[in-house]
Each structure stands twice: as structure tokens, then as C-alpha cells.
A protein has these predicted regions:
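Bacterial N-terminal signal peptides
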Residues: 2-16
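Aromatic-residue detector
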Residues: 1-2, 97
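OB-fold and OB-like single-stranded nucleic-acid-recognition modules
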Residues: 20-201
């Protein structure tokens, strides 16, 4: 009996390590937060690309925070109207990556990123993608997804800080330069993600 109890106790100790190490099993950085629809019914607050890049303070999140829950501003929904400058529909995680600027003639690196997850995660995302497709229909799209002529769009969705692209830890002021064409400031890591609705202004 003592041997059996000892074996059970040992098994518990051995299993505790892997379970603790496997608490974060998301397939991509903060994936549950990126596809979540629980905030979709909140009333959106107005925002702009200029305000996001100039006034939204970055949270203390970095690449190591792979499963960090939403907090602070990320618990709010925002509506942004801007000009679609680039659309990338071929991302590893299946999201559509869209770059939005304040004006049609704004520098392309003054963009914010908004992302629409795949239809399989919610019909909302399918509708948002369909509306975006209708907005860019007939536009010339260059290699890499850049639109020859920008198109105006309204975007509604949850704020999200993509700390995966932060260079140097949770308090760094630089990104790794891999966040699309948007500038390398940490504030440019703020996204609207997921996008719940796309509208024609």
C-alpha cells in the first residue's frame, strides 16, 4: 500500500511540471484575444489613426506575454474611419491584415493595423470581409497588397496591443519593424483586432 501511495504521489509531482509549463497553449500570440467576439455588442467609442498613434499609451506587454488576457483599453470597442492603403489576405494565422491611414495622402508609415479573423470564428468576420471586398472591388492592388488608389472605410472593433512585435521587453519604446509598413514606434503596435464591422462611410 505504501509503495502504491508513493507511486501516486510521484506521478502527481511529475505531472505538475508539464501542466504548469503548458498553461499557455495558444497557437499564435494572444490568439484567444484576437478572435474573441465577447466585446462585439459594446457601444463603440470614436477614435482616429492620429489619436491612436499620438495618444494611446502602450501597456507593459511584450513577446513573452503570449497568453495575456485583455486589460485596460483592450476591453473597449472603437470606431475608426480612415483610408485603406494595403490589404494582405495571406497571413500565416489566416487573418486579413489591413493598413489604414488618416488621409488618402498620409505617409504610408503613419498607418494603424486592423485585422479581420477568418469566417470560421464568427459570421461577423465573414460579413466584415465581404464588405471590405466590396469597397476595394475594381481597385488595382499592387504586389504586396498596396492599393493604387486608397479607399475610405469605417472600421469597428476591439483595441488590441500586439506586443509580439515589441523589441527589447515590456517597457521598450521600439517595435521590431515587422508590423507591416507602419512606423516603428511602440504606439503603432495598437491595432483594431478583431474587426467586428466594416462600413462604407
Amino acid at each position: 500500500m505504501a509503495v502504491a501511495l508513493g507511486a501516486v504521489a510521484l506521478a502527481g509531482v511529475l505531472s505538475a511540471g508539464p501542466l504548469g509549463a503548458q498553461r499557455c497553449r495558444q497557437p499564435h500570440y494572444r490568439w484567444a484575444q484576437k478572435i474573441d467576439t465577447s466585446l462585439a455588442t459594446l457601444a463603440p467609442q470614436p477614435a482616429s489613426a492620429v489619436a491612436i498613434l499620438g495618444t494611446w499609451e502602450p501597456p507593459h506587454l511584450g513577446a513573452q506575454d503570449r497568453c495575456a488576457p485583455r486589460a485596460g483599453r483592450e476591453l473597449q470597442v472603437y470606431s475608426v474611419t480612415g483610408w485603406v492603403r494595403r490589404v494582405d489576405k495571406v497571413k500565416e494565422d489566416g487573418d486579413w491584415h489591413i493598413e489604414l491611414t488618416e488621409r488618402a495622402d498620409s505617409p504610408v508609415d503613419s498607418c494603424i493595423v486592423v485585422e479581420i479573423p477568418a469566417l470560421r470564428y464568427s459570421p461577423r468576420y465573414g460579413r466584415a470581409r465581404a464588405t471590405l471586398d466590396s469597397l476595394i472591388a475594381g481597385r488595382t492592388i499592387r504586389r504586396g497588397g498596396a492599393l493604387h488608389r486608397p479607399v475610405r472605410a469605417g472600421i469597428t472593433g476591439a483595441a488590441f496591443f500586439d506586443g509580439q512585435h515589441r523589441r527589447g521587453g515590456r517597457r521598450s519604446d521600439e517595435s521590431d519593424g515587422e508590423h507591416g509598413r507602419c512606423n516603428t514606434s511602440v504606439r503603432a503596435l495598437w491595432e483594431i483586432h478583431p474587426v467586428y464591422e466594416v462600413t462604407r462611410p
